[in-house]
Amino acid sequence: MLNALTEKRTRGSMLWDYLTTVDHKKIAILYLVAGGFFFLVGGIEAMFIRIQLAKPENAFLSAQAYNEVMTMHGTTMIFLAAMPLLFALMNAVVPLQIGARDVSFPFLNALGFWLFFFGGIFLNLSWFLGGAPDAGWTSYASLSLHSKGHGIDFFVLGLQISGLGTLIAGINFLATIINMRAPGMTYMRLPLFTWTTFVASALILFAFPPLTVGLALMMLDRLFGTNFFNPELGGNTVIWEHLFWIFGHPEVYILILPAFGIFSEVIPVFARKRLFGYSSMVFAIVLIGFLGFMVWVHHMFTTGLGPIANAIFAVATMAIAIPTGIKIFNWLLTIWGGNVKYTTAMLYAVSFIPSFVLGGVTGVMLAAAAADYQFHDTYFVVAHFHYVIIGGVVFGLLAGVHFWWPKMFGKILHETMGKISFVLFFIGFHLTFFIQHFVGLMGMPRRVYTFLPGQGLETGNLISTIGAFFMAAAVILLLVNVIWTSVKGEYVGADPWHDGRTLEWTVSSPPPEYNFKQLPFVRGLDPLWIEKQAGHKSMTPAEPVDDIHMPNGSILPLIISFGLFVAAFGLLYRSDYAWGLPVIFIGLGITFITMLLRSVIDDHGYHIHKEELPNDDKGVKA
């Protein structure tokens, strides 16, 4: 009985610890769990899509249900799965890579997570409250303004809440990388995952405000009767396209750049070579970020903007392939001549190269404005997009999860299960999407819930569906791997791969709450590798052992986010029910009173005294 009470108390305290944490490592786990959950939700929606399209005139889903599932699949995967899973790895790794004890603003870090989480929950509650959004993940104004029910309203309000969390996270990482680097960690000594996080965070800072403006205008149109996008009353639907895509295309680079950073960490470790062309890689990252804001109109070649606009954006789109090509060749030259160890993470990294190149080639094909009239709104675009996002972002996430899992949890994922999962996923991915290039060229439009027999589309769609089941099996095996590792996996040391090059591999696995007992002194690029080559057993400390200041946990980020969650329901049902307006004020009251409490209550954190630090933990082991 006593043991049961103790276990219950322990579970309760662990739950409270995660609800109130401001520790970047625990917030990384929260992002990983929430993002993983939404990834499974988006995957189930994808399976529904592929089952519906497995044969002509299938009745597995109705037209309306298909539109809702298709819309929520794209929205969930982009905003609620890929982004938070990348934030999980950023939170887990970036402070360690730069030799910091936490991010610049731990409280805001927690707030960013809870805003994302409540925004995602709000969006998915639409399934149970009258129907999900049904206008596609791009929610073009001509469709969304005339959508019945509240599905689009859930889309607009949910994305505004979660988008605010993303914007906060981007600002936080910018401040962290600028201000929290260890002594000697100059910009040109930053690991490339940190560099890509830095540039992606800058893109977030400039890309998300246009989306926020567009969502706000759509909210005003739908809930308050304005006409920004209604052409019948002087509005312009093309304004929505511009606002969405000037966010939407940088969003692709917000996703792919951190994945590039992951590959740039994984490949040198398992090729056992220094990354080829570090300076050119940094240049390419910055150039991709800059050019990413100059190509959004290639999504709008068929809207009638004219040949001059189309030509300018076509050239800019083709130009962005140049820095990407630089990165591809540098990764190949890093592998060339290396003593390559093919772990699961390395398999994902190596397979990414041909997969992503194929996605890039079809991207350049789509950049030809004249040809785009044939490709536009067909499955050719669907195939291109998924080759970039799955072949780039998802492969990067899977490589990063296998690579840094032991750093986050202290145990290595089972390699045999990991490799079987990789083979299933790789085969399933190419089975699903390669054939879609040809299905699209044969004329199959995207976003349609069925197709007629006798058009030559049956075989291609069936192959795509079979491939999707391979991918589903791979994800299930990955979940089995995670459970098996948590139960039976063995604990590992600071550098489980034995060839770690950067500072995260100098601390224990998982790291202590304070990360570094003494901040390390960085003597060059790949600082741990430098110390290993010099025969040193530990990093050179940059400071004497002293008391370590730590931030207190807080429940306030969760309460602030919950207040906006409540207010969103009031705004949604304001015109339907009398309780809508009071609920708005209650929700905003919760948020603003909590913010006021945060402002007036002094919270100076606490100190871990140097006498409490373990003597055997140097904090910066090599």
Curated annotation (Swiss-Prot):
GO molecular function per UniProt: cytochrome-c oxidase activity; heme binding; metal ion binding
Its membrane topology: Multi-pass membrane protein
InterPro entries assigned: Cyt_c_oxase-like_su1_dom (IPR023616), Cyt_c_oxase-like_su1_sf (IPR036927), Cyt_C_Oxase_1 (IPR000883), Cyt_c_Oxase_su1_BS (IPR023615), Cyt_c_oxidase_su1_bac (IPR014241)
UniProt keyword terms in alphabetical order: Cell membrane, Copper, Electron transport, Heme, Hydrogen ion transport, Ion transport, Iron, Membrane, Metal-binding, Respiratory chain, Translocase, Transmembrane, Transmembrane helix, Transport
Record-listed heme a3 binding positions: H384
All ranges on the Extracellular side of the membrane: 1-27, 89-110, 179-196, 262-284, 332-346, 395-421, 480-552
Cytoplasmic side: 47-68, 129-159, 216-241, 305-312, 367-374, 442-459, 573-580, 605-622
GO CC annotations, alphabetized: plasma membrane
Enzyme Commission number, as recorded: 7.1.1.9
TM annotation in the entry: 28-46, 69-88, 111-128, 160-178, 197-215, 242-261, 285-304, 313-331, 347-366, 375-394, 422-441, 460-479, 553-572, 581-604
Protein name, UniProt field: Cytochrome c oxidase subunit 1
Gene: ctaD
